[in-house]
């Protein structure tokens, strides 16, 4: 005891341990870098190799927003002359999503990049094709983010308004205020990073999905006339009580239902930040559309059954699940909880979409194809704060300005979702075309992988063409014009970049790689080194 109190052997042992640790650190710092490895990853500014599977699942599920998609997508498919065929539409859309997932996983099993589809496409296409794919993907992220912000403000505003003494719908001022509040929440969460917020994001989405699944089961279980799953499937192709237009109507519904899957691959944007990305990312990309598709199919069955039995007009209703529950005598119990769940699902989707948007801008900034300031990160959270500021300003100021100018909330959402879905589909075409070319280049092309990629690309090209026609016929030509304008500007910008900055063009497609800093023999970054 006296020895310990007077600084005897105990202090000597601690001193020896500290000295030993210092010698090990000095040996590591003085060792030679491993030959053949870069000193550090191109994405060293990010908090690499820290995220587990839960964070990636939260990102992909949040981007799809299965609760919100399952409430809004089926009614659109039904009203577009699909009728009961909407159930077939949902099932076929799930198959298309799985084909696209197979093409994407060609890359996720071999590389990790925050640019996701943009960086993947560069491995199989030329730089111009990759840049156009990335531009379309940016448009997809931004369009869906705008739609989610507007929709979340609308749903939450509806709950607030119905809870007020007047019980009227939300006014423009309330919607703008709530949109700004949601945007602030998105900014805080994305700035802090997925590592600290993924559990919240996943929890919100899981609770929202449970609410939608429970509401769908309630619709199917309430006393009254019902159609079994098999009855709906067998009644789908011919004309029925909902006015199915046969195969053409089913195909129109497939296009709409496919929009309920866009974003399922966005977990790939977290590749460099994920532990064991070549194992985790492919699994998430494969299973996320399956899980989300199951919810969508259940909700579609419930809505087809409900519209057939209640006489609610699917072409008129703005809140289908609410109206169907009300028609079945369940509206009072389900109205506010369901709308809150859907509103929160849209918030989660906005967070995930902005997260992916920011990572894509970061990747482009790292390559130098856009300003390198987008590659700067927060010193503490190691998230791309400059890209966040630019991206969030775009997706927030545009809808707020439109609302203040008197543009109807529904019109803003329709243009945004039309633009976003078109952007996603074009990006999916790019990566589906790139997959077999990449496999052939590395000598791993097989008949199965080629068939899946070709089928996905062919179906997507057909759907993009049909979706453009649907948007034009529905009077939503603005979404098509935005897509055409963005891709045209991207082509002009790329041609100028190739002429004046050819080395930056050659950098397109950079992906994460093991560096000498990642192994024991490497020289770690100096303490206190700037991450920006």
Question: Which positions does each model-derived feature cover?
Answer:
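Transmembrane helix-boundary motif of multi-pass solute transporters/channels
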Residues: 35-154, 266-267, 272, 469, ...
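Transmembrane helix-loop boundary segments of multi-pass membrane transporters
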Residues: 76-81, 85-87, 161-172, 195-204, ...
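Membrane-interface "cap" regions at the ends of multi-pass membrane proteins
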Residues: 1-85, 97-98, 223, 230, ...
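Helix-loop-helix junctions that connect adjacent transmembrane segments
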Residues: 42-47, 90, 165, 171-173, ...
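Membrane-helix boundary/coupling elements in multi-pass transport proteins
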Residues: 136-151, 266-273, 332-372
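TM-loop-TM module centered on a large, flexible mid-protein loop between adjacent transmembrane helices
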Residues: 119-122, 126, 161-162, 287-353, ...
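Membrane-interface loop-to-helix entry segments
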Residues: 174-225, 284-292, 423-426, 441-457, ...
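A generic transmembrane alpha-helix motif of multi-pass inner-membrane proteins
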Residues: 73, 221, 424-427, 445-532
């Amino acid at each position: 005891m006296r020895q310990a109190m007077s600084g005897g052997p105990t202090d000597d042992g601690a001193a020896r341990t500290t000295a030993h640790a210092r010698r090990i650190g000095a040996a590591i710092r003085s060792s030679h870098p491993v030959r053949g490895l870069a000193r550090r990853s191109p994405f060293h500014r990010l908090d690499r190799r820290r995220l587990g599977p839960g964070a990636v699942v939260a990102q992909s599920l949040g981007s799809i927003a299965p609760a919100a998609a399952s409430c809004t997508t089926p009614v659109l498919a039904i009203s577009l002359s699909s009728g009961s065929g909407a159930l077939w539409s949902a099932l076929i859309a799930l198959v298309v999503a799985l084909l696209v997932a197979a093409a994407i996983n060609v890359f996720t099993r071999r590389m990790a990049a925050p640019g996701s589809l943009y960086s993947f496409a560069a491995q199989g296409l030329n730089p111009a094709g990759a840049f156009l794919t990335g531009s379309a993907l940016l448009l997809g992220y931004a369009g869906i983010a705008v739609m989610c912000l507007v929709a979340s403000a609308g749903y939450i505003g509806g709950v607030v308004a119905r809870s007020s003494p007047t019980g009227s719908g939300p006014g423009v001022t309330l919607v703008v205020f709530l949109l700004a509040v949601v945007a602030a929440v998105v900014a805080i969460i994305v700035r802090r990073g997925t590592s600290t917020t993924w559990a919240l994001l996943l929890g919100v989405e899981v609770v929202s999905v449970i609410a939608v699944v429970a509401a769908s089961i309630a619709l199917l279980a309430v006393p009254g006339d019902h159609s079994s799953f098999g009855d709906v499937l067998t009644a789908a192709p011919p004309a029925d009580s909902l006015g199915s237009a046969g195969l053409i109507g089913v195909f129109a519904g497939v296009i709409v239902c496919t929009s309920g899957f866009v974003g399922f691959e966005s977990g790939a944007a977290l590749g460099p930040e994920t532990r064991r990305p070549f194992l985790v990312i492919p699994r998430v990309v494969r299973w996320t559309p399956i899980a989300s598709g199951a919810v969508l199919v259940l909700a579609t069955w419930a809505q087809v059954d409900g519209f057939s039995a209640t006489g609610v007009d699917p072409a008129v209703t703005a809140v289908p699940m609410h109206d169907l529950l009300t028609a079945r005598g369940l509206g009072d119990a389900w109205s506010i909880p369901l709308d809150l769940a859907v509103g929160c699902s849209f918030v989660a989707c906005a967070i995930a979409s902005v997260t992916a948007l920011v990572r894509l801008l970061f990747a482009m900034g790292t390559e130098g194809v856009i300003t390198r300031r987008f590659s700067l990160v927060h010193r503490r959270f190691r998230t791309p704060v400059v890209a966040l500021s630019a991206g969030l300003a775009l997706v927030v100021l545009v809808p707020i300005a439109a609302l203040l100018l008197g543009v109807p909330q529904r019109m803003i959402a329709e243009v945004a979702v039309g633009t976003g879905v078109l952007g996603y589909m074009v990006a999916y075409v790019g990566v589906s075309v790139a997959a077999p070319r990449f496999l052939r280049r590395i000598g791993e092309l097989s008949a199965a992988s080629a068939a899946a990629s070709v089928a996905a690309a062919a179906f997507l090209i057909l759907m993009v063409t049909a979706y453009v026609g649907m948007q034009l016929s529905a009077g939503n030509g603005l979404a098509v014009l935005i897509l055409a304008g963005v891709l045209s500007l991207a082509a002009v910008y790329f041609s100028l970049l190739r002429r004046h900055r050819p080395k930056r063009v050659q950098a397109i497609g950079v992906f994460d790689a093991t560096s000498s800093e990642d192994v024991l023999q490497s020289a770690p970054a100096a303490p206190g080194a700037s991450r920006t």
